[in-house]
A protein has these predicted regions:
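Binding-site signature for planar aromatic cofactors or substrates
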Residues: 1-217
């Protein structure tokens, strides 16, 4: 199959469907329901999500990160504050997330404002990370240019020696971010691109605080 043919391939969507009556009026509860489905289906890294950010120059940047918590307050991930995404979020604290669970032909897209979580929350999460990952958070000046791999290995050795067998504190340049959603879109794949799409939009006038609308595929 040529590259263009592959791009035009329809895919094999099972005959799942998504009805308005089946949706939870709260998008976070609905997301968590779908997340549980993805875990039950054996999706590898169901918490992997594409995170799109833009800085003051308007140039977009996207990468995959891991969701660490989701509740009524929003979606939490952790990173280096001095990384490209950290700098962009400092300049423009809005972002978009996309989860793709291909085994279920499902996608969830989220947009909203992003704020850092408090230090206590970041400290608590950092303490649960493997020691090697804690060392890496100190050793890696994320997104900065390296002379070669040896330079990074040297930094790891230096950090390891610095803390020896002592507990490793959270670096001041590393911590969590919480995206508070103002829109959540659910996408359920259907045959012939006649997919089911529903958009939750935050709306104070609605009894649930959210307006739900079906979108054209």
């Amino acid at each position: 199959m040529s590259g263009n043919e592959g791009m035009r391939a329809q895919g094999s969507h099972e005959h799942r469907e998504l009805r308005r009556a089946e949706l939870d009026p709260d998008p976070i509860r609905q997301f968590l329901r779908w997340f549980d489905d993805a875990e039950s289906a054996g999706v590898v890294l169901p918490n992997a999500m594409a995170l799109a950010t833009t800085g003051a120059d308007g140039r977009p940047s996207v990468r995959h990160v891991l969701l660490r918590e989701a509740d009524q307050r929003g979606f939490v991930f952790y990173t280096n504050h001095d990384s490209r995404k950290g700098r962009q979020l400092g300049e423009n604290p809005r972002a978009a997330l996309v989860f793709l669970w291909k085994a279920l032909d499902r996608q969830v897209s989220v947009t909203g404002d992003v704020r850092r979580v408090d230090d206590a929350e970041s400290d608590a999460y950092f303490a649960t990370r493997p020691r090697e990952a804690q060392i890496g958070a100190w050793a890696s000046a994320q997104t900065s240019v390296l002379r070669d791999r040896h330079e990074l290995d040297e930094r790891v050795e230096e950090v390891s020696a610095r803390f020896a067998d002592a507990p490793i504190p959270r670096p001041p340049h590393w911590g969590g971010y919480r995206l508070t959603p103002d829109t959540v879109e659910l996408w359920q794949g259907r045959p012939f691109r006649l997919h089911d799409r529903f958009l939750y939009t935050r709306d104070a006038d609605e009894g649930t605080g959210w307006r739900v609308e079906r979108l054209s595929p």
